[in-house]
Amino acid sequence: MESKREYDYILPGRAESYWLATVPEPSYPALKGDIRVDIAIIGGGIAGLTTAYLLKEAGFSSIAVIEAGRILKGVTGHTTAKVTSQHSLIYDRLLSKFGKRQAQQYAESNQAALEKIASIVASKKIDCDFVRKPSYVYAGSEDSTNKIQNEAQTARNLGLPASFEENLPLTFKTYGAVRFNNQAQFHPVKYLNALAEEIHEDGCHIFENTRALKIEGEEPVTITTDKGTIRARKVVQATHYPIHDRPGLFFQRLYQSRSYVLGVRIRDPFPDGMFINAEEPVRSLRSQSTDKGELILVSGEGHRTGEEEHEISRYQNLEKWVRSVYSVDSIDYRWSSQDAISIDHIPYIGRQTSGNDSIFLATGFKKWGMTTGTVAAMIITDMIRGKYNPWEEVYDPSRFKPVESAKTLLSQAVEATKGFVGDRILPTHKEASQIGPEECAILQNRGGE
């Protein structure tokens, strides 16, 4: 019998995601032997399953989704499941850093992803607790009010349903908020289990407990797994971290962040909406209807993975805070999630490398994967169909230029690798004379270094 961890004796609540605890677990077979398909998708979360669903809806009839463990047991099953184009305070930063065109692409794509989910729920009549609600980013201190006002103005100028609100119906003091109307929340596992049922029939397959080990070649691409080999015309990597990392060096261009969730019953009435503050530490709130009444999901306390020795304190901080602002009846659930974040905080979606139409990538969703994972599915589906997508530029995995990115990349590499480099960094040029203007390169000296 497995012994309990130290914090099981200290922290209240069931150590399991509410989403996974409240839905029967489906079962799909493992791969047996070698197969050939048109499209192979690695990863059984929202990005992988939505991509498979959209491709099948577009007429592709030979698709395989492979998952190393069980579908939806990773990040997707441990989300807070806000379906919104409001990703904290992002639009003012996007406008200043990337310009209006790319900020517009990000805004339009995530708003479209929200509506795509709503459309699928309606057309397939999926019972997944989908409900429209306003979403708020609030200022927890006066120092953040100007940022909130600027964000509201920028988001509104980009065509988003944004407004500035001076007062919120919360039990604690706030200093203004940016409100997005007509956003949504849902039960992600109910939603994606329904999509999985649509996928796994008529020549399309989901294979669980099938780990991808290696990806090689181009059309056909060969995926070596621990259960057999898959050959496919196109491959989509919708994993938390790319299996096929080189070229691209994504181990240097992504870092991991862990955050924590409590499922809380309170005696106070909870207002209509989803809420998150603009400061650190993050405090995020949303409600979920259950058979036992309303459950409030309280989340935050994010930190870089590996930098916290005592994770128990993160749960305790959330518990202390929620008890300070609400009358708590019970804490029924607790869980944590680990997210991948890119160095510029925009996901990598599209062709893994420019010019390669065989291998596609979706990663770095920065804790907003319900919409960005759906954006990934929409963009990659269009690319595989040979159809232009108006949002692909802002998410392009090859968007970094050496001179502009070198300082950030080097700094990120130190944090991400922690001494782990191995053979991933290979020489790119033989001689220094081969390096062009505004380029950087990796050289091998005569001593082999």
Where on the chain are the PLM-derived regions?
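Flavin-dependent oxidoreductases
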Residues: 215-287, 419
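N-terminal pre-ligand scaffold of iron-sulfur
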Residues: 394-449
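Extreme N-terminal leader/targeting segments of oxidoreductases
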Residues: 1-39, 57-61
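N-terminal Rossmann-like FAD-binding beta1-loop-alpha1 element of flavoenzymes
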Residues: 37-65
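C-terminal catalytic lobe of FAD-dependent flavoproteins
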Residues: 279-280, 308-309, 313-317, 324-408
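Flavin (FAD/FMN) cofactor-binding and adjacent substrate-gating region
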Residues: 2-21, 89-95, 119-194
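Helical element adjacent to the flavin cofactor pocket in flavoenzyme catalytic cores
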Residues: 146, 154-156, 178-234
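Glycine-rich active-site loop/strand segments that organize a redox cofactor
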Residues: 74, 78-109
